[in-house]
Amino acid sequence: TYRCAALDCAAEFADDDLYAAIAKKLPSLKNNTAKTDVISWLGARHAVSQAGTVIAAIASSDPELARAAIRAAGRIGGQEALDALVAQLDGPHAREASAALAAFNGKPNAAFAAALDGTPRTQANALKLVAMRRITTAADKVFALLESPDAAVRAAAYDALAGVASPKDFERLCDLLDKAQEADVKALQA
């Protein structure tokens, strides 16, 4: 589209002033496709100065715009974006938020570990991130979630063990293996 071509041409000389001018026009754009293009462009440009605008778009009722904002927030980074993305782990766009967090540039480990105290859906999504980042300091929480009443959380916790367990957890892993149900043995052996 012409809009995308114009944004691409502007990328050469884009700076915080241009980002601010474009973001200021965002509310006046008539359709969500145009807003989605602008939000995606801000994310692709890593427009840190417009993190607030991008994060606000996460709450859009338009699913495409919300998903574009989630992806853009992941590219922009920063604590505010991290908090907004972690909050989405229990929302309708949890899959998109998980993908953005998996590629998040920064230091999200503490936020991922803290998300293990969230709702069951947040816990299940955070367990995957904790394992992928190999956050061994979250091992105690992961072991505790093996006892969760929620089946999805329990399954995610067993899957996460391979990413968070360290040699100091050998005894606990052996105890789990002795007591494990057949379905859980494969996850423990990983």
Specify the residue positions occupied by each region the protein language model found.
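Repeat-solenoid scaffold signature
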Residues: 150, 154-165
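Residue-level detector of extended alpha-helical repeat arrays and alpha-solenoid scaffolds
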Residues: 3, 19, 35, 66, ...
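Amphipathic alpha-helical scaffolding segments comprising HEAT/armadillo-like alpha-solenoid repeats
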Residues: 1-4, 15-28, 35-36, 47-59, ...
